[in-house]
């Protein structure tokens, strides 16, 4: 965290006049809000959690109470400011003694980082948009080609699909009584 948090001045009013200065209480609340937001988002990084373990913070009851206090960040009016939602997962896990004790193991930290990077590599915000074309049947069969078949042109795809079905039904499965 920064020693002296940088607080932006109030935005100008709609008539382009300068907004009144913040009261000392409002300024203090803003500093506290930014500091707690920055801290809770630091919890999203496993190496930071490892550092907290090394420095002994995770064994102090006052620090554990502070972590419980930070649970208010799950409320809708606060959660919208969180950029790294993984921090809330780790905030929950930090409430358990087993997780706190495992943070001393660098292999465990490496595994947390691997799982996290794997999650972010495959994570999507929403479902992919479905095209109208994907709802229709494809022009070319998606069935695997036999060794002696060549890829067909799209206009001949439906015709070849029928041939494949006939060929498969003729070949059938080789039973115990049939010769190879």
From Swiss-Prot:
Quaternary structure (record): Component of the Mediator complex.
Skewed-composition ranges (Acidic residues): 145-154
GO cellular component: core mediator complex; mediator complex
The protein's role, per its UniProt record: Component of the Mediator complex, a coactivator involved in the regulated transcription of nearly all RNA polymerase II-dependent genes. Mediator functions as a bridge to convey information from gene-specific regulatory proteins to the basal RNA polymerase II transcription machinery. Mediator is recruited to promoters by direct interactions with regulatory proteins and serves as a scaffold for the assembly of a functional preinitiation complex with RNA polymerase II and the general transcription factors.
Location of the protein in the cell: Nucleus
Biased composition (Basic and acidic residues): 127-138
Keywords on record: Activator, Nucleus, Transcription, Transcription regulation
Organism: Cryptococcus neoformans var. neoformans serotype D (strain JEC21 / ATCC MYA-565)
Name used for this protein in its record: Mediator of RNA polymerase II transcription subunit 31
GO biological process per UniProt: regulation of transcription by RNA polymerase II
GO molecular function: transcription coregulator activity
Family, similarity comment: Belongs to the Mediator complex subunit 31 family.
Region annotation Disordered: where it falls in the sequence: 1-24, 123-180
The UniProt record lists the keyword Transcription regulation: yes
InterPro entries: Med31_sf, Mediator_Med31
């Amino acid at each position: 965290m920064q020693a002296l948090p940088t607080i932006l001045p109030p935005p100008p009013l709609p008539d382009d006049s300068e907004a009144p200065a913040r009261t000392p209480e409002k300024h203090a609340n803003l500093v506290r809000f930014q500091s707690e937001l920055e801290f809770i988002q630091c919890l999203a990084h496993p190496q930071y959690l490892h550092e907290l373990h090394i420095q002994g913070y995770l064994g102090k009851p006052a620090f554990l109470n502070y972590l419980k206090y930070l649970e208010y960040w799950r409320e809708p009016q606060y959660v919208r400011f969180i950029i790294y939602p993984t921090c809330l997962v780790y905030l929950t896990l930090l409430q358990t003694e087993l997780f706190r004790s495992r943070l001393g193991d660098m292999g465990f930290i490496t595994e947390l980082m691997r799982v996290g990077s794997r999650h972010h590599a495959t994570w999507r915000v929403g479902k992919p948009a479905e095209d109208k074309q994907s709802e229709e049947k494809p022009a070319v069969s998606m069935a695997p080609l036999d060794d002696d078949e060549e890829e067909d042109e799209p206009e001949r795809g439906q015709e070849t699909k029928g041939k494949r079905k006939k060929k498969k039904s003729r070949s059938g499965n080789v039973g115990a009584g049939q010769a190879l």
